[in-house]
Swiss-Prot record:
Any one GO BP annotation for this protein: iron coordination entity transport
Name of this chain's protein: Petrobactin-binding protein FpuA
Species this chain originates from: Bacillus anthracis
Any Pfam family matching the protein: Peripla_BP_2
Places the protein is found: Cell membrane
Assembly description: Can probably form at least three ABC transporter complexes, composed of two ATP-binding proteins (FpuC or FpuD), two transmembrane proteins (FpuB) and a solute-binding protein (FpuA), or composed of two ATP-binding proteins (FatE), two transmembrane proteins (FatC and FatD) and a solute-binding protein (FpuA).
GO CC term, one of those recorded: plasma membrane
Length: 324
């Protein structure tokens, strides 16, 4: 009987100990979510008493970052055009308040929302930094940091935003999913055994009634992604471009005409079917004559976050391996 009682006491104490450990872990986790944090960004460091719950976002890439983390902002700039031009699986809910354009956000509307945090890009936010900081702690990011490697900056910024809203574990999963998508896209390209993996990539549109191209440079997010897929950019800009592209005209495409040409164009502004049709400078390009052109969706956002990068990688692999 004593032996049975002793065993019972040991089991009871063990169960109590396990219960206490679980409670302690819960308390620790809760405490961590309420701890003060420091966010590093292009304008320095910003301290928050605890992770932000009510966030206003004034640039699309950071809106995408928040949404990928499962966080709906309370306010967001230019929601209508975000939904039109940013091809990602997660969209803002109907409850998110539009706070004006990215270029001219509505400060009164932002103030009315009483946010815990404002996120924007430094090249836009610097001019209204004081006004924004009077409303709420403000962080500003800049893609041209991280040695002007837009992909490296994107991932680091995403981690900082995840930290700012207490979603670091969720952030790790988003980045892991992105890496898996890259690996899958690369495997698909390798399986296709392409003879030519040289590429040039551009956005095409009309500017001042002239067919215009943004030819992407090595430091751009998009070409850092395609590099991970085993593709090689052939466009030489001659210098590092802070924006990740060089804006030019059709005549400049001669330097990359031996490559596969990957392009993004909106259906309502398809310059290839309108202004360039019959244009000798366009029609005589080698990739045009040899049908080495690969169209991505018009809402492929090349200045975005992990979901945009994932979409880009998947699309590139699909179009490059599709039979023509």
């Amino acid at each position: 009987m004593k032996k049975i009682l002793s065993i019972f006491i040991v089991v009871f104490l063990f169960a109590v100990g396990c219960g206490q450990q679980k409670e302690e872990k819960k308390e620790t986790k809760a405490d961590n979510k309420n701890q003060a944090i420091t966010i590093k960004h292009a304008e320095g460091e910003t301290k928050l008493d605890k992770p932000a719950k009510k966030v206003v976002v004034l640039e699309w890439v950071y809106s995408e970052d928040l949404l990928a983390l499962g966080v709906q902002p309370v306010g967001m700039a230019d929601i209508k055009n975000y939904n039109k031009w940013v091809n990602t699986k997660t969209k803002p809910s109907k409850d998110v308040v539009d706070v004006g354009t990215r270029q001219q956000p509505n400060l009164e509307e932002i103030s009315r929302l009483k946010p815990d945090l404002i996120i924007t890009a430094s090249f836009r936010g610097k001019a209204i930094k004081n006004e924004l900081e009077q409303i709420a702690p403000t962080v500003m990011f800049d893609p041209s940091t991280s040695n002007n490697d837009h992909f490296a900056e994107m991932t680091e910024t995403f981690k900082q935003i995840a930290k700012a809203v207490g979603k670091e574990e969720e952030g790790k999963k988003v980045l892991a999913d992105m890496d898996k998508a890259f690996a899958d896209a690369k495997a698909k390209i390798e399986k296709a055994d392409l003879k030519d993996k040289n590429i040039a990539m551009a956005q095409a549109f009309t500017a001042k009634n002239v067919p215009t191209f943004r030819i992407l440079t090595d430091n751009s997010l998009a070409l850092q992604v395609t590099k991970k897929l085993g593709l090689t950019n052939t466009f030489e800009a001659g210098k590092s471009e802070p924006d990740g592209f060089k804006q030019t005209t059709v005549e400049s495409l001669q330097s990359v005409q031996d490559s596969n040409f990957i392009y993004i164009v909106a259906d309502e502004d398809n310059i290839f079917d309108t202004q360039l049709k019959g244009n000798p400078a366009w029609e005589e390009l080698k990739f045009k004559k040899e049908n080495k052109m690969y169209k991505l969706k018009g809402d492929t956002w090349i200045f975005g976050g992990p979901e945009s990068a994932t979409s880009l990688a998947t699309q590139v692999a699909d179009v490059m391996t599709a039979k023509k």
